[in-house]
């Protein structure tokens, strides 16, 4: 090959990997893959058995590889029950979070083995891997096979690119996202919370080390700076601004250019044409709602309807049959007998429309929707800010908790605690957001919507950066040349000792240069003068 005959942007095989993650994890990755395919690259998809449907709607995916078994219904329910029971305010609740993560990561050995077998075959070896955060076996594949990698994160990685003005554990703070308005006591509490989390994750760390040891691999310490491309599906304005290394870029919100229109669901379209102040309620496909929480939610929504702050409720809720039985047997429901729960859940109340599935983006984009009561999952958060809908946040676990705080800090929502909220609190928050007496919520919603719209084009930057890293990696060395150059986007301090990268050796020389003459003068003055 000569420089003159080489292509500037040759087509390559790119493997997208999503394992225990679901639609929220796969959708932004596949949207970036769509852009890469339009540039001539071949796209293949690796997933767990049963998740092939994530990729089948996308004609650009040329092949689907199964790299692990599916999660059973029982395992799925047990996992998300653990997440729902997790609570950062007590030791057992914190341990519950890491027990749930252990279940997620128990798929690592199987996916690692199968991915290793896949990339070992020259017929399927990819030129680049684009992986979901939860498919962390891809990092080991990168290290072992020297295949360049990009990892998609729904928020800024917790341990990468730390900043002194961001207290505690980023993404897992108790109260403050930055130190700007935090008191000294607040910051001390955040640091103490980090110690609590470290103690709670002890079994999780030992579990990971045991798995890796059984596979013949050593521990993999998290880097302060990545040695792979990190694509963060978020943006500054929602995230706290901070300096980032070249291999970390915010690319969110990554959303498809089109979405399913409302005319595919005539009953919802008719409802929105009749009602003009509708709150949309959705808690995702994995959040289980206990009867007491449903009762408070419905009671709060009924109060908001009675006060006139809203005139309709659209609730996306697939599995509500079991909750209906629990509500009927719940003794606390006697206190609010005037609320006809069965009529509401059976869609016999004109103010409510409860359906198993909705075209969410079309709902949020409709002018009749004035509020979104959400669990603040990654997709839901991005769609809410992009379509300009204020949020009553009721996060449950993981990045949802941070997203709830971020929406409130950005002035586009109010955050509630799922463990102890009341119906009166919910109706009061709806009133505050809808009436918006100072106009601050409307102003901030529009502000953040415009920022999100501008940043939504950064998915093309993600594709650019993938090509950049991929082309750089394949020409860093050759069979003829032993010398290999480092990644062009990796800062040199990542390959240096902490001592040298911080110039401590240089400072020691300065101290010596100052101390020796001073010491000599003092010795001379004490002994000769």
Swiss-Prot record:
Gene3D superfamilies: Glycogen Phosphorylase B
Membrane topology of the entry: Single-pass membrane protein
PROSITE patterns: UDPGT
Listed EC numbers: 2.4.1.-
Keyword Ubl conjugation: no
Industrial and biotechnological uses noted in the record: Stromemycin was found to show antibacterial activity against methicillin-resistant Staphylococcus aureus (MRSA) as well as significant protein tyrosine phosphatase 1B (PTP1B) inhibitory activity. Moreover, related O-glycosides show also significant anti-HIV activity or alpha-glucosidase inhibitory activity, as well as moderate cytotoxic activity against cancer cells and thus are promising candidates for drug discovery projects.
UniProt keyword list: Glycoprotein, Glycosyltransferase, Membrane, Transferase, Transmembrane, Transmembrane helix
A Pfam family hit: UDPGT
Transmembrane helix in keyword set: yes
Positions annotated with a glycan in the UniProt record: 70, 420
Gene Ontology MF term list: UDP-glycosyltransferase activity
Family: Belongs to the glycosyltransferase 28 family.
Protein name (database record): UDP-glycosyltransferase
